[in-house]
Swiss-Prot record:
Belongs to the membrane fusion protein (MFP) (TC 8.A.1) family. The chain crosses the membrane at residues 12-32. It is found in: Cell inner membrane. This is p-hydroxybenzoic acid efflux pump subunit AaeA. One of its GO terms (molecular function) is transmembrane transporter activity. InterPro entries: CusB-like_dom_1, CusB_D23, MFP_Efflux_Pump, PHBA_efflux_pump_AaeA, RND_pump_MFP. GO terms for cellular component: plasma membrane. Keywords: Cell inner membrane, Cell membrane, Membrane, Transmembrane, Transmembrane helix, Transport. SUPFAM superfamilies: HlyD-like secretion proteins (SSF111369). The gene is aaeA. It is a single-pass membrane protein. It comes from Cronobacter sakazakii (strain ATCC BAA-894) (Enterobacter sakazakii).
Length: 310
């Protein structure tokens, strides 16, 4: 009898443990698959690719890599003497055509005043036509002067906004061409998080929902708000061939990988450059309000920790 009781007790304990294990596994599985969260999230920021509008030798570089700069602060300067001479030449052309236009205006005025009684209509018309030609040349010279003045101004490259200089790859003495990217500027106070959520979790993601962000390798938890959800993503399994026909990749009907959709998250507080653009984080959407961690069960706390750092 005692042996039977022992067997029943052991069997009952085993059954209870198996049931508890199944419950724990089911809850963990539900927690991981149904709640809107992702480890595939990255800090992003507005980045300006700075390229000069003029070409020439770089005469000075006034900043260093990763420096925080203010709007309109000088970054580097390009060959000002050359463009100063071009401006002086353009101004000389303007002065020449102004003097010529004044002379032709006086001549045309005299001929118009004398009229056909003193000279032929052809001579009068010729004087007026010469005046119009000179005036057009003057307008062209003034436009060239204005462009030369603009080019001279643009030899000084300035920061378009407050931010951090990054990937600075220009040096004094180098020749830089027009339109070639010289440096990137990461705008200050423009950081946000781009989270790539699986399509199966988008039901729990809405603009205005609160979000927890845990940077990889950090114990800090940042908070933010869902700003927007992308309206579309590229279909990688369907392309076009050279004749425009659809090319669709073969797949297994019983294997379906969830597509990831970009979700833009607005941060409550800007972290500066503590978390550089491109670094990764774990994102958890908590719904219409922030999660009260003090009221969570030990199981949920454990799951959150595993989710954030697993």
């Amino acid at each position: 009898m005692k042996l039977l009781t022992t067997k029943i007790t052991r069997t009952a304990i085993t059954v209870v443990l198996v049931v508890l294990a199944f419950i724990a596994i089911f809850r963990a599985w539900s927690f991981y698959t149904e709640s809107p969260w992702t480890r595939d999230a990255r800090f992003s920021a507005d980045v300006v690719a700075i390229a000069p509008d003029v070409a020439g030798l770089i005469t000075s570089v006034d900043v260093h890599d990763n420096q925080l700069v203010k709007k309109d602060q000088v970054l580097f300067t390009i060959d000002q003497p050359r463009y100063q001479k071009a401006l002086e030449e353009a101004e000389a052309d303007v002065a020449y055509y102004q003097a010529l236009a004044n002379e032709k205006r006086r001549e045309a005025g005299r001929r118009n005043q004398l009229g056909v009684q003193a000279m032929s209509r052809e001579e009068i018309d010729q004087a007026n036509n010469v005046l119009q030609t000179v005036l057009h040349q003057l307008a062209k010279a003034e436009a060239t002067r204005d462009l030369a003045k603009l080019d001279l101004q643009r030899t000084v490259i300035r920061a378009p906004a407050d931010g951090w200089v990054t990937n600075l790859n220009v040096y004094t003495g180098e020749f830089i061409t027009r339109g070639s990217t010289a440096v990137a500027l990461v705008k200050q106070n423009s950081f946000y998080v781009q989270a790539y959520m699986e399509e199966t979790k988008l039901e729990g993601v809405r603009p205005g929902f609160r979000v927890e962000i845990t940077p990889l390798g950090s114990n800090n938890v940042l908070h933010g708000t869902v700003d927007s959800v992308s309206a579309g993503v590229t279909n990688a399994s369907s392309t076009r061939d050279a004749k425009g026909m659809a090319t669709v990749d073969s797949n297994l009907e019983w294997v379906r990988l969830a597509q990831r959709v970009p979700v833009r998250i607005r941060l409550d507080k800007q972290p500066g450059n503590l978390y550089p653009a491109g670094t990764t984080a774990t994102v958890v959407v908590t719904g219409e309000r922030d999660r009260d961690r003090s009221q969570e069960s030990a199981f949920n706390k454990l799951m959150h920790r595993l989710r954030e750092f697993g």
